[in-house]
């Protein structure tokens, strides 16, 4: 699933040549062409430090460490985004499935998918996000 045919215009307009220079090949394929990194290979799958996870393309803060949980799926999982305005959700009918794709609402970068099998004592949602779509900014617990 590529973003090439999308009709939504995002506030942050990306220059493809600049993105290819700045991002790793995996980051580019994940964020720009909705690729998925292999399970259990992502940099942030097991990260437990306090901080904020930001979009690797535009640096928009997306998730905080307090919403992260171990789902066992092989990708970083969160029960909610930082707020309701940072995420864009689209129906994804690729690979013979119907899922909800999650994108950065500022630049349109593909992040992953959201499923309804998250912690029931929280939102019940599991935002399953590719590490390649994120940068982590460590912060002290009390900030």
UniProtKB/Swiss-Prot annotation:
It catalyses: L-methionyl-[protein] + [thioredoxin]-disulfide + H2O = L-methionyl-(R)-S-oxide-[protein] + [thioredoxin]-dithiol. Its cofactor is Zn(2+). Its EC number is 1.8.4.12. It is an enzyme of class 1 (oxidoreductase). Residues 16-139 form the MsrB domain. Signal peptide: none annotated. One of its GO terms (biological process) is response to oxidative stress. It comes from the Bacteria. The keyword Nucleotidyltransferase does not apply. The keyword Transmembrane helix does not apply. One of its GO terms (cellular component) is cytoplasm. PROSITE patterns: MSRB. Keywords: Metal-binding, Oxidoreductase, Zinc. Zn(2+) binds at residues 55, 58, 104, 107. Binds 1 zinc ion per subunit. The zinc ion is important for the structural integrity of the protein. The active site is at residue 128. GO terms for molecular function: peptide-methionine (R)-S-oxide reductase activity; zinc ion binding. PANTHER family: METHIONINE SULFOXIDE REDUCTASE, METHIONINE-R-SULFOXIDE REDUCTASE B1. Belongs to the MsrB Met sulfoxide reductase family. This is Peptide methionine sulfoxide reductase MsrB. It comes from Burkholderia vietnamiensis (strain G4 / LMG 22486) (Burkholderia cepacia (strain R1808)). The gene is msrB.
């Amino acid at each position: 699933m590529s973003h090439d045919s999308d009709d939504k215009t995002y506030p942050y307009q990306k220059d493809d040549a600049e993105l290819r220079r700045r991002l790793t090949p995996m980051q580019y394929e994940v964020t720009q062409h909705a690729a998925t990194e292999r399970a259990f290979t992502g940099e942030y799958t097991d990260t437990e430090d306090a901080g904020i996870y930001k979009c690797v393309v535009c640096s928009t803060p997306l998730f905080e460490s307090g919403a992260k949980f171990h789902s066992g799926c092989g990708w970083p999982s969160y029960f909610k985004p930082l707020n309701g305005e940072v995420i864009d959700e689209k129906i994804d009918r690729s690979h013979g499935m119907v899922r909800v794709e999650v994108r950065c609402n500022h630049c349109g970068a593909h992040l992953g998918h959201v499923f309804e099998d998250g912690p029931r004592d929280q939102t019940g949602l599991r935002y399953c996000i590719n590490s390649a779509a994120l940068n982590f900014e460590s912060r002290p617990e009390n900030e």
